[in-house]
Amino acid sequence: MDPKATSTSKTDNIDQITIIEEKVNKIGTEPTIRKYSKGRMLGKGGFAKCYEVTNLENKKVLAGKIICKASLTKSRAKQKLISEIKIHKSLRHSNIVEFEHVFEDQENVYILLELCPNQSLHDLIKRRKRLTEIEVQCYTLQLICGLKYLHSRRVIHRDLKLGNLLLNDKMELKICDFGLAAKLEFDGEKRKTVCGTPNYIAPEVIEGKGGHSYEVDTWSLGVIIYTLLVGRPPFETSDVKQTYKRIKACEYSFPDHVSVSDTAKNLVQKMLTLDPSKRPSLDEILQHPFLKNANNIPKFLPASTLACPPSTSYLNQFASPENSVKVPSQPAPKSAEATPLAAQKNGRFINTQGSNMFGSEKTLVTSPHSATTQAHTNENVVLTSQLDRHQTQGEKGWNFTKTGSWQSNLNGTQSVKGSSRPQTVQQKGDLKSAQSLKAPALLNNLGSRLRVSGSAVGSNRGQVLSGNEVWVKKWVDYSSKYGMGYNLSNGTTGVFFNDNTKIVFNQKTDQVTYIQRGKNDRQDTVTHYSLTEYPKDLQKKMTLLQHFKKYLEGSEYGGSESINDGTETQIGVYVKKWVKTKNATLFRLSNKTVQVHFTDRTEIILNSENKQVTYVARKETEPISP
């Protein structure tokens, strides 16, 4: 007998907690109740909403896709849901989101899926704008592995897009959302349903006359590769009809201002061919020069690539000797320009920080539709020149059989262990950041969101940082509503808002600086005001700035830490990007300093100006838990 469920909710003094109760009926035994707590929303689509769901019995955290039965009044919608469940439930592959469980009650259908905390490639492109070719190669190989499995099971996905490609806590790519997928009954069968997402849809689907098959996924894969390399889909326009017109004419080009290799262009051109029969098979794609040398492509990318491109030293590990980029013996840690890591339009990255189960692209349906990745270190060595090499342990190389399948032996990860004393070392390469991107629970009290790098480590930090160094002294995470407020060591107070704007108060000059991203991602727009004179549309943000300032300066944390005056050029330093992960909070300042504050109260500060990496240990008397 299929399990049934009922859902109830209870409210405490802080937040409303919704408990989903599943009544499990087993033959020969009394019914049992399995309980889940419903957490933050991860995304939503036309018929469903996705939430973080925790099994209260085993504490396993899942993604719960909840479909309201009231939206399934039409028989076609019901059949679509049944088909999605049937297809997804039958799939088991490392590059496909795992189907855990399904049950229902009188109001909803609940589909429990593997949680992918590092979000989707759509979210990644919003932050990074575009990826390096080695990253595109890595994700493409994983996607092809998943597609080969699907096609071997006679399944066409039919809605491949960046929003449906998720990253789990190990940075594995996972295909999700089988709402438009089709299961063919026999080889050579064609489907004629017009379905998909406008920017990714294949021309034969739009035409609809001769039907379509597996080749539509190949077309979408070509669009995905182009989008990852360039930063926007090849046929995108402001009008869907115009987009379809360009797709049917295969009208696109590579922009001159973006550097794309000839081999990458050639592969995309072969895949974006109007005649489906002339598109390369998945095995032929694997043999293309862009992907053929799989041993020089990492199997998984470091979590730092969620925020910035791989460093030159990291890339050189996978480059052939003749193509290796020559670098100085001790270069500064690379810090690339990237889109801020705070919330975009929907605030999902910092605000909810869950995987985007549905993406943000509009899907069209018409009829005849880690484990944390961490640096591997010795107990007595915190940062060494070998960090980049550790970055790829268990990640390097693809081993394809004749059918294109691959086997991996991913080495187990180790926790980062710090020495008992602060130390400053020269370091090349980039540091792998922690991965599992989970926001803290929503709290009513602003004070309860305070996180401080203050007095407990402040004295230690002072021993290893120069007098004109600037760092984040303390901060408060209120991104569930507004943003993140912070104090710098030079006395500056700032707020990084969820809409990616920033406001900074200089206590020496009483000047307020407001920073907005320029149109078309060009240079930021910077305007200056005072605390008393500013435009009316900044009233709310100015009020929030003063609230954050008052709270941080009056908090009990870090009060004994002296302010580092800094130099005049450093007074303009502010937090340009930030991200909160499961094991750390990362800040990138406008002077390109990168600060990582781990949950065990240790810190790492990377200074690109003086090519210095500073490690700050916690005090022996300080508890490990924050």
UniProtKB/Swiss-Prot annotation:
Keyword Disulfide bond: no
Region (Disordered): 399-433
GO molecular function: ATP binding; protein serine kinase activity; protein serine/threonine kinase activity
PANTHER family (UniProt xref): CELL CYCLE SERINE_THREONINE-PROTEIN KINASE CDC5_MSD2, SERINE/THREONINE-PROTEIN KINASE PLK
Entries under SUPFAM superfamilies matching the protein: Polo-box domain, Protein kinase-like (PK-like)
EC numbers: 2.7.11.21
One Gene Ontology term, aspect cellular component: nucleus
Signal peptide per UniProt: none
Modified residues (Phosphoserine): S71
Reaction(s) this enzyme catalyzes, per UniProt: L-seryl-[protein] + ATP = O-phospho-L-seryl-[protein] + ADP + H(+); L-threonyl-[protein] + ATP = O-phospho-L-threonyl-[protein] + ADP + H(+)
Organism: Zea mays (Maize)
Polar residues bias spans: 400-427
Binding positions for ATP per the UniProt entry: L42, G43, K44, G45, G46, F47, A48, K49, C50, K65
Function: May play a role in the division of some cell types.
Lineage of origin: Eukaryota, Viridiplantae, Streptophyta, Embryophyta, Tracheophyta
UniProt keyword list: ATP-binding, Kinase, Nucleotide-binding, Phosphoprotein, Repeat, Serine/threonine-protein kinase, Transferase
Active site residues according to the UniProt entry: D159 (proton acceptor)
Origin: domain of life: Eukaryota
InterPro entries: Kinase-like_dom_sf, POLO_box_1, POLO_box_2, POLO_box_dom, POLO_box_dom_sf, Prot_kinase_dom, Protein_kinase_ATP_BS, Ser/Thr_kinase_AS
Family label: Belongs to the protein kinase superfamily. Ser/Thr protein kinase family. CDC5/Polo subfamily.
Location of the POLO box domain: 471-554, 574-626
Residues covered by the Protein kinase domain: 36-291
Gene designation per UniProt: CCRP1
Name the record gives this protein: Probable serine/threonine-protein kinase CCRP1
